[in-house]
From Swiss-Prot:
Biased composition (Polar residues): 679-690, 737-746
Listed Basic and acidic residues bias regions: 630-640, 667-678, 792-814
Organism: Xenopus tropicalis (Western clawed frog)
Region Disordered, annotated ranges: 586-827
Protein name as catalogued: N-terminal kinase-like protein
Keyword Coiled coil: yes
PROSITE patterns named among the record's database cross-references: HEAT_REPEAT, PROTEIN_KINASE_DOM
Gene from which this protein is expressed: scyl1
Coiled coil segments of this chain: 788-817
A Pfam short name: Pkinase
Length: 827
């Protein structure tokens, strides 16, 4: 029979922890948690004592009532237990309102916004009990109100509840609760009243206690104290001596919700919308989330964490809110600790990165600084970086820009392959081919800032070549960024590279058209010269100055203060220049030019400025170039870098037929075809030419360089022959006076005729004069002696070929009978 004598409390599935806080009517409340899942709860306990039968009966009534009443504003019942010795009521985790107010005193007290919403909830609970349940609470006071984790108020204390009209059956209150009784309780002459009159009087007592502290006696209700002015008229109705004047809870709620009322504020409006968010239209949800971020600063922290955040997560997962949930989501994320952030925010962020919604992607990139510290390296490399890199190839310039900027935050968490291979490959393509100058500039900026995270081999391959390419950019901020990049990463270059590779590039920038670029170049040159001079005077300092060259990882503070980093670094520099069309960049690139552009130049993609080649002297020959064309023409034999096309990707076509040994050749190594419109003063006709692939002879002109990547492709025979002809004195193809009459002919035959050795040679030219842009006489003699004769020869050959074709056609027409099956027509 031991089974029947066992204590039922031992099987209670909850552990009671924390200190017991005493409540009226013999109850006490403690914190607890479920034994199996560890869920937090609050445990209300009542010890049954002999001689307190009426109070025990009221406690049992409270247990019965709370089991059956279900309302969002009434304390939620979880579990309960009734034994001969005690009563247990398990509810959601809550704190008594009196304790909550005391805890908030140190932090400035409970705000009026919180109180307004709390009172709103209590009045709604009373309206439900009186109007829907026909019940009288009969115990509305501060000790009967509890606050949950989100700061929402719940109505409890159901010990003295009774059915409306059955006042005689109501349990008797204790002496400590008599101060909350309405005047008609003792004055039998006031028998005319409404069923809600007693509860509304108690509501007035609650309002007084919330603003002024515990109620000492009923007469204290006459003193308003700290009650807000907007609430005073409605408060006076509640504590009026005439019970008939006291409004119904629903009417009181409506009065306080009127314009200027105590319940008319953004906090209450937000809560009311969240309660009905599941039935709201998508357009209403969109507007709500857009305005929510502005109001969060004035909302309580606990409310944001436990009430708004779950709604935001639900709206993203099951709704169509989209990118508008991101700003409030990340703003609330600041209130979370690291574990909560990992549990609630990070899974949503990872899922968002796989979205194809552009607005979502750009918002994520813009807000990355808010959550990057909570992302671990495996998550970044496996789930985030593969989606982020798609932004490098997006057609929207704003997304490309934000993707570049985000690399500053992601780089420290990227693994070896993603950082040194994948990211560098995308940077290479952006810097060489992106049609937006500011994006090319920011790519250079970002490369300089993440240089400390690159491994030494990648730094040696990339930095000099990338910054050298940037100094050739037609966009002046990009050129300045290239110069500043050299200066910021000076500790990553050996003294040999400083003298042989870096300084020659910087010296070429000293004649840049932009004064700011020139000034930065001179500063950088002086810095490198001081470094070289220091080692020259004291060779023992060589090891100290080159200590970071082969260091695997260098502190990013090394490049932290480099002269403003191309105007504004990776702040919103691009927004000043990026436009919807391509003309904005052309205008920015040509800004400050002394000579006006021709119509043909305005339609061309960006071409790099030729600071190394001086403009040719004015010639008296009728076949001389326009001055604007000569100024931008590169020296083909010495510096073919300027043939690089900085225009849009659509205008640049990759050379075909070449074997690729690595991915870097795809992005950097191949020359690009470039169209140029040439004006001849004699005929004024415009002819398009296709320049051969750039013939780089300098280590500094290898794009992003990567000496192995650019030299793995063997030159073709035609390219080798063309190069040898240039060195022997043959002029570029652009110098011939092209005959427009032959434009309809076949271009292959025309170039074949040009490749034949000419019967006339210019004795005045020798191998040393190849690439000399200053010899006007040489240019004139070449065009006068060879240009016209070759054109005539080509025209004659085409005419002969045309005659042969016409003769064959005539033979076929003259032939009688049908053609044999299987015979293939040649023309």
């Amino acid at each position: 029979m031991w089974f029947w004598s066992r204590d039922p409390a031992r099987d209670f599935p909850y552990d009671v922890t924390g200190e017991r806080e005493e409540l009226p009517a013999g109850w006490g409340v403690q914190k607890g948690k479920k034994k199996t899942g560890g869920d937090a709860v609050s445990v209300f306990t009542y010890e049954i004592r002999p001689g307190a039968e009426e109070q025990t009966q009221a406690a049992k009534t409270a247990l019965k009532r709370i089991k059956t009443l279900k309302h969002p504003n009434i304390l939620s019942y979880v579990d309960g237990l009734e034994t001969d010795k005690c009563l247990y009521i398990v509810t959601e985790p809550v704190t008594p309102l009196g304790t909550y107010v005391k805890l908030r005193t140190d932090s400035g007290g409970v705000s009026e916004l919180e109180i307004s919403w709390g009172l709103h909830q209590i009045v709604k609970a009373l309206s439900f009990l009186v109007n829907d349940g026909n019940l009288i609470h009969n115990n509305v006071c501060m000790s009967a109100v509890f606050v949950d984790r989100a700061g929402e108020w719940k109505l409890g204390g159901l010990d003295y509840m009774y059915t409306a009209g059955a006042e005689d059956t109501a349990p008797l209150k204790g002496i400590e609760m008599e101060k909350y009784n309405p005047p008609e309780k003792t004055d039998r002459s006031k028998t005319s009243k409404e069923k809600w009159s007693a509860d509304m009087w108690c509501l007035g007592c609650l309002i007084w206690e919330v603003f002024n502290g515990p109620l000492p006696r009923p007469t204290a209700l006459r003193s308003l104290g700290k009650i807000p002015k907007s609430l005073v008229p409605h408060y006076c109705e509640l504590v009026g001596a005439n019970p008939k004047v006291r409004p119904n809870p629903a009417r009181f709620l409506q009065n306080c919700r009127s314009p200027g009322g105590f319940f008319c504020n953004s906090f209450v409006e937000t809560n009311l919308f969240l309660e009905e968010i599941q039935i709201k239209d998508p357009a209403e949800k969109q507007t709500f989330f857009e305005q929510l971020s502005e109001n969060l600063d004035s909302f309580p922290e606990d409310f944001c964490r436990h009430k708004i955040l779950p709604q935001l997560l639900t709206a993203f997962e099951f709704g169509s809110a989209g990118a508008v949930v991101l700003p409030p989501l990340f703003k609330i994320g600041k209130f979370l600790n690291a574990d909560e952030y990992q549990q609630k925010i990070i899974p949503v962020v990872v899922k968002m990165f796989s979205s194809t919604d552009r607005a979502m992607r750009i918002r994520l990139l813009q807000q990355m600084e808010n959550f990057i510290q909570y992302l671990n390296e495996p998550t970044v490399n496996a789930q985030i970086f593969p989606h982020v890199v798609h932004g490098f190839m997006d057609t929207n310039p704003a997304i490309r820009e934000q993707t570049v900027k985000s690399m500053l935050l992601l780089a420290p968490k990227l693994n070896e392959n993603n950082l040194n291979m994948e990211l560098m490959k995308h940077f290479a393509r952006l810097q060489a081919r992106d049609d937006q100058g500011p994006i090319r500039c920011n790519t250079t900026v970002c490369l300089g800032k993440i240089a400390p995270y690159l491994n030494p081999a990648t730094r040696q391959r990339v930095l000099i070549s990338a910054f050298s390419r940037a100094t050739k950019d037609p966009f002046s901020p990009s050129r300045a960024a290239g110069v500043l990049g050299f200066a910021a990463t000076h500790n990553f270059y050996s003294l040999t590279d400083c003298a042989g590779k870096v300084l020659p590039v910087l010296c070429g920038v000293t004649v840049d058209p932009e004064k700011n670029v020139r000034e930065q170049a001179f500063k950088a040159i002086r810095s490198f010269l001081d470094k070289l001079e220091t080692v020259s005077e004291d060779p023992s300092q060589l090891a100290e100055l080159e200590k970071d060259v082969h260091t695997a990882s260098v502190s990013p503070s090394v490049v932290g203060g480099w002269a403003g980093w191309a105007v504004t670094g990776v702040s919103s520099l691009t927004s000043k220049f990026i436009r919807t069309g391509g003309g904005a960049q052309d205008a920015a690139a040509s800004e400050g030019a002394s000579a006006p552009s021709t119509a043909s130049e305005a339609s061309k993609p960006d071409t790099a400025p030729s600071s190394s080649a001086p403009p040719a002297a004015a010639s008296t020959a009728p076949t001389s170039y326009e001055p604007e064309e000569e100024k931008g023409a590169p020296d083909n034999s010495l510096d073919r870098w300027d043939d690089e096309d900085w225009g849009s990707l659509e205008d640049a076509e990759q050379n075909r037929g070449q074997t690729e040994n690595d991915d870097w050749d795809t992005d950097w190594g191949h020359g690009k075809t470039q169209e140029k419109t040439v004006d001849f003063s004699s005929s004024r006709s415009k002819t398009k030419q296709v320049s051969p692939p750039p013939n780089r002879t300098s280590a500094l002109d290898d794009g992003w360089g990567w000496d192995d990547a650019f030299q793995t492709v063997p030159p073709s025979k035609e390219h080798t022959a063309s190069k040898s002809q240039q060195l022997e004195g043959t002029r570029p193809a652009s110098d011939y006076n092209w005959d427009t009459s032959g434009s309809s002919g076949r271009q292959g035959d025309f170039f074949a005729s040009l490749s034949e050795p000419s019967s006339q040679k210019n004795d005045n030219r020798n191998s040393d004069s190849a690439g000399d842009w200053g010899g006007d006489d040489n240019w004139e003699s070449v065009e006068a002696d060879q240009g016209l004769s070759k054109a005539e020869m080509a025209r004659k050959k085409r005419e002969e070929r045309q005659k042969e074709i016409e003769a064959k056609r005539a033979e076929r027409r003259a032939a009688k009978g049908p053609l044999k099956l299987g015979v293939r027509k040649l023309d």
